[in-house]
UniProtKB/Swiss-Prot annotation:
Listed name of the protein: Cysteine--tRNA ligase
EC numbers: 6.1.1.16
Disulphide bridges: none
Oligomer status and interactors: Monomer.
């Protein structure tokens, strides 16, 4: 398996720290608002990475944190008239609602910053003792000059960074690039007691302290969005390696941005979309399919047209799965030619995933499987053994992509299946009673809502369009 490592700027063979285990840390959301579609990309992608490792037989220790205290949370809490701790907890609950609908599994651990203050304080103390950090008037800063490898992750030169620094001038700092490990409490803000007086952690130290606690030194994979490479992940590397004297994470993976009309998504441009707003129009599995349809390091342009294309592509798979369920196969074992074809599709799938998790190419193998499967069903030669092989192959894609195929849709969290089936039953009774106008009215109204009824030898089927 090869992974593109941001640290070395090359694809490298993945060799885990411990055979049979993968230790992963992915930066989670700052809990001051609902997640947007840009947040959803790393959440879904790294969930898929975790799923693939598990499919290959690895035990995955997966940590995704919550930053539940920072300036944005404090400001939002003031607006909402609740405490920052309450606000953080509120949006953690809302995060899980959205993540569940995107098919995201719970991490092994979801640590919160507010529950790891002692570990953070110990790490800050250690950095001061080792000469990498200094305290000024209740604030503690990391001295970037003290760490000779500063810039190695992002590829930035420290002297050039100093020359072009647009950092807010702070006379307390020795160097404008020095970053806060501990912030002195301001009036009215939450605070914790520390050796430097009341205060709270800086942003970067949180992830270092929590990843070292749960994954240990020199863990396997650290992931996040490309926007975190500098300064967040660069600062994590500096403070962690200064603290332990050992390499931090071994493989750094970063997903590309989501754009809207080729522009970066931002609130100021008004092209900012919350996941739950999108889920009002599209099922979670369609959104997940869309997010995995492009290689994770490439930019991904977002609009309704592309989501509709993802929906149509997913329906092709759904229709095949439905046809496979309904076909009455011939008795007999799987045919050799079918075994060989399906083995080839799964080989292509594995090769794509092992080449830096190329989900787009892996999906192409799924559609090859679907095309071939449809021809076999149409031929009338499908055996019971053939059918079982197709079902087993589909289970692999479901397991890794985290998408159930052939299921009836949910919109805005509501399962419409019982309502549609009730209307189908009412329509059937109306037709028996020769009330064809009313039966046609139900069919036509459902069509207006995007639901098509199809008469088949086994009864009426329905699907979305």
């Amino acid at each position: 398996m090869k992974i593109y490592n941001t640290l070395t700027k090359t694809k490298e063979e993945f060799i885990p720290r411990e055979p049979g285990k993968v230790y992963m840390y992915v930066c989670g959301p700052t809990t001051y608002n609902y997640i947007h579609i840009g947040n959803a990309r790393p959440i879904v992608f790294f969930d898929t990475v975790r799923r693939y490792f598990e499919y290959k037989g690895f035990e995955v220790i997966y940590v995704q944190n919550f930053t539940d205290i920072d300036d944005k949370i404090i400001n939002r809490a003031l607006e909402e008239g609740i405490s920052p701790i309450e606000l953080g907890q509120k949006y953690i609950i809302e995060y899980f609602k959205d993540a569940d609908r995107l098919g995201v599994k719970r991490a092994t651990v979801h640590p919160k910053v507010t529950e790891h203050i002692p570990e953070i304080i110990e790490m800050v103390k250690g950095l001061i003792e080792k000469g990498y950090a200094y305290e000024v008037e209740g604030n503690v800063y990391f001295a970037v000059d003290s760490f000779s490898d500063y810039g190695k992750l992002s590829g930035r030169d420290l002297e050039e960074l100093k020359a072009g620094a647009r950092v807010e001038v702070d006379e307390k700092k020795k160097n404008p690039l020095d970053f806060a490990l501990w912030k002195k409490a301001k009036p009215g803000e939450p605070y914790w007691e520390s050796p430097w007086g009341p205060g709270r952690p800086g942003w970067h130290i949180e992830c270092s302290a929590m990843s070292l606690k749960y994954l240990g030194e020199n863990f396997d994979i650290h992931g996040g969005g490309a926007d975190l490479v500098f300064p967040h992940h660069e600062n994590e590397v500096a403070q962690s390696e200064a603290f332990t004297g050992k390499p931090f994470a071994r493989y750094w993976m970063h997903n590309g941005f989501i754009t809207v009309n080729q522009e970066k998504m931002s609130k100021s441009l008004g092209n900012f979309f919350l996941v739950r707003e999108i889920l009002e129009k599209f099922p979670g599995r369609v959104v997940r399919f869309f997010l995995l349809s492009t290689h994770y390091r490439s930019p991904l342009d977002f609009d309704d047209k592309k989501l509709n294309e993802a929906k149509a592509a997913l329906e092709r798979v759904d229709n095949f799965v439905q046809n496979l369920k309904e076909v009455n196969p011939l008795p007999g074992e799987a045919r050799i030619e079918i075994q060989e074809k399906i083995t080839n599709f799964l080989r292509d799938f594995n090769e794509a995933m092992e080449d830096d998790f190329n989900t787009a190419q892996a999906m192409a193998s799924l559609f090859e499987l679907v095309r071939f499967g449809n021809t076999q069903i149409a031929s009338g030669n499908l055996t019971a053994g053939d059918k079982k092989l197709f079902e087993e192959a589909l289970n692999v894609y479901t397991q890794v992509f985290g998408i159930e195929f052939g299921v009836l849709e949910k919109i805005a969290g509501e399962d419409i299946t019982p309502f549609v089936e009730l209307l189908i039953e009412v329509r059937a009774r109306l037709k028996k009673e020769k009330k064809y106008d009313l039966a046609d009215f139900i069919r036509d109204e459902l069509k207006k809502q995007g639901i098509i009824l199809e008469d088949t030898p086994k009864g009426v089927r329905w699907k979305r369009v």
